[in-house]
């Protein structure tokens, strides 16, 4: 099994080396993308790239971006060609969330095992899967 690619992430506190962790939210079966950073030699949760808004309308490859550090996260998505930022927004409470149409093939390159699990939760995508 080959090593997962590492992506650079720049934010207000500096630069981080990030791996992505792909999954599915339990409620609503939406696309989950977590960000892992190495701490003391161990890859652990750094932040969530996405947020679960199960009552907002979205396609299976779309997700809403967590509001904390969203400007930096949107730049990260663009820099690493993870997907396309959409004009629609999601809402929950007083927060507004950017919506992104993620490139599932690109996500397969970054976390093949996570995408296998994601495709198991979405059998309608199985013929598109290359992992």
Region spans (language model):
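Acidic, aromatic-enriched beta-alpha/helix-loop junctions
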Residues: 34-82
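Short, cationic low-complexity segments
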Residues: 115-131
